[in-house]
């Protein structure tokens, strides 16, 4: 197996998935290609290759490109089971870090539950203060308080860390989804206490839904003080989101009104907006 990875190999593995190396634009506000006032200041790395945005809440310097960890390369084990190729994953993360990426986004449900552990093993080789981890409370099948707390604690174990930089309520569409998975169980009280204790550095949610659903969640900001929100934003979704989904322009403007910074998912629309040339 190759012991190094070049830019073309990296883009073929990562860029085509549109969740790796460009799947998350971290802590950024965007308006038609311009940086919004809520996005914080920008600065270049020493080599000028990566731009960083400042988290206005705590001063984190976050790379404008993050690494989505939903599509790590897979191989078969001796029993024919699909498992993450840890060696290649390590090399991909090494390449990303070498080129200034410091934000890594995963979730308990990614890759049949394998993503967090593989990501944690790779990142453990680096100083903890040199990168930011984002993961999610993906309590879709069992939203009980006990299960939600265990999922959160299991994320800490899998990621081999004692705190999470950016923690998201996974895939909210509005108040009904929020109440059924988070509002009624008491988990929000627990998560707020974890934030106060520093084990969650930033608390927010990822969103897929209508403008009305987003308005409902924005109405909760005074109570829960969202530190950030993850939205899908690209040049198609900016004003032509599919179905009943809210346009990204509307979502970003509503966040800007409240001074909430955004993290971007799907800037390449699952790879459909980008092709890696063969030459």
Annotate each predicted stretch with a short phrase.
Residues 126-145, 149, 170-171:
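Structural motif corresponding to the early beta-alpha repeats
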Residues 172-279:
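Beta/alpha (TIM)-barrel catalytic core signal, keyed to glycine-rich beta->alpha loops juxtaposed to Asp/Glu
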Residues 62-66, 103, 130-134, 163-166, ...:
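Structural preference for beta-strand elements that scaffold enzyme active sites
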């Amino acid at each position: 197996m190759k012991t190094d990875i070049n830019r073309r190999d990296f883009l073929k593995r990562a860029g085509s998935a549109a969740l790796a190396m460009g799947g998350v634009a971290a802590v950024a506000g965007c308006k038609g290609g311009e940086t919004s006032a809520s996005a914080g200041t920008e600065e270049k790395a020493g080599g000028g290759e990566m731009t960083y945005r400042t988290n206005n809440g705590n001063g984190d310097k976050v790379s404008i490109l993050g690494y989505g960890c939903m599509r790590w390369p897979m191989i078969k084990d001796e029993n024919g089971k699909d498992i993450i190729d840890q060696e290649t994953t390590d090399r991909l993360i090494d390449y990303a870090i070498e080129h200034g990426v410091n934000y890594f986004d995963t979730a308990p449900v990614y890759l049949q539950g394998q993503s967090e552990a593989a990501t944690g093993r790779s990142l453990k080789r680096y100083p903890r203060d040199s990168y930011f981890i984002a993961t999610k409370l993906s309590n879709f099948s069992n939203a009980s308080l006990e299960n939600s707390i265990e999922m959160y604690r299991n994320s800490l174990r899998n990621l081999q860390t004692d705190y999470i930089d950016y923690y998201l309520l996974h895939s909210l569409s509005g108040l009904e989804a929020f109440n059924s998975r988070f509002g009624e169980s008491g988990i929000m009280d627990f998560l707020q206490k974890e934030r106060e204790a520093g084990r969650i550095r930033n608390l927010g949610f990822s969103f897929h839904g209508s403008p009305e659903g987003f308005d409902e969640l924005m109405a909760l900001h005074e109570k829960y003080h969202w530190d950030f929100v993850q939205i899908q934003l690209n040049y198609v979704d900016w004003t032509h989101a599919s179905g009943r989904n809210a346009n990204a322009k509307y979502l970003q403007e509503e966040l800007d009104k409240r001074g909430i910074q955004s993290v971007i998912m799907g800037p390449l629309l699952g790879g459909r907006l980008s092709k890696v040339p063969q030459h």
